Amino acid sequence: VDWQGKHVTVAGLGVSGVPAARALHERGALVTVVNDGDDERTRAQAAELEALGVTVRLGDGATLPPSTELVVTAPGWQPDKPLFLAAAEAGVPVWGDVELAWRLRGDDGRKPAPWLAVTGTNGKTTTVRMLASILRAAGLRTEAVGNIGVSLLDAVVGETEYDVLAVELSSYQLHWAPSLRAHSAAVLNLAPDHLDWHGSMEAYAADKGRVYEGNTVACVYNVADPATEDLVREADVEEGCRAIGFTLGAPGPSQLGVVDGILVDRAFVADRHKQAQELAEVSDVDPPAPHNIANALAAAALARAFGVQPAAVRDGLRAFRPDAHRIEHVADLDEVRYVDDSKATNTHATEASLAAYDSIVWIAGGLAKGATFDELVIGAAKRLRG
């Protein structure tokens, strides 16, 4: 893309909008930032960009500025916003921050780092951080980026060089990323979430499935969640790209799984019909709850797709420590264990959390986001106390 003099509207300030506006301005684009909010924080961000020569319009994110040739949006902006409807009517393309990062790869002459991408309703952050830990254990220069930690755009255009990136992608980000082509990608699971944003479960799943499009080496799916394998079947991938499953049971050919407390690989071995490679022990996973073992298997599959040796998988999992609020052990008092899993913000994540324990007093709250809870409560009824 020749950015010089190109009129670009960036929709939204914040962790994605500010880096996008800065990167585009540095490449000669004529950037206008629009933002719905107008508060102290956004005014400070606006002042920072205006000092560079970027036009910022606060309190009005609905109107498409004249002469706009491209819109780059923050991932949370819904597709039915008036700004995007006006862009569609005018024939103006809309990209997300991930699409922009993908398009800017290598534009400084450096060899772009391949992306190992992870999406799913739950487990994305943990899996990406596990993957980054494994890649580091293999001696690779990497970072956990995307919807986590370091901005993906900053990782792509910044001075630090990487061998590979572990990329967390939300359904919002994938919706606006039509050109993304990962080295390998995983969809961990699919359950109703963000239906207020996507409009339907079908639209939500379709956006998740975009992560497989154009994959070159492996599409990793959850054997226990057939909807993820369906997305692999529907994807248009490069010749030779393989479907790789992960399961908490004994793996079949082209799968990773668990046998007698050992994480094993029957996908990336010389004879997957007769051989299995030991990767790590279940006890190497922290915490060793079933859903977290599944996360570890998905991370291992992506790492193995990138050529990482088994010892690095083991060492990376041993080095990994989970973030706060993810089945976090808080205290033991009067023979009761207190656990913080407040990152479980939908029914699927909550179901996985409750399944990790036999007897539970469950304290819950938050927004439903279009979901219902009857099946969750019925399924967990035997475990619930109090």
Language-model segment annotations:
Residues 35, 58-60, 95-100, 143-146, ...:
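Beta-strand->loop->alpha-helix junctions that form or flank phosphate-binding loops
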Residues 12, 24, 71, 118, ...:
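Residue-level signal for inorganic ion chemistry
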Residues 64-68, 75-223, 227-240, 357:
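Phosphate-binding loop of NTP-binding sites
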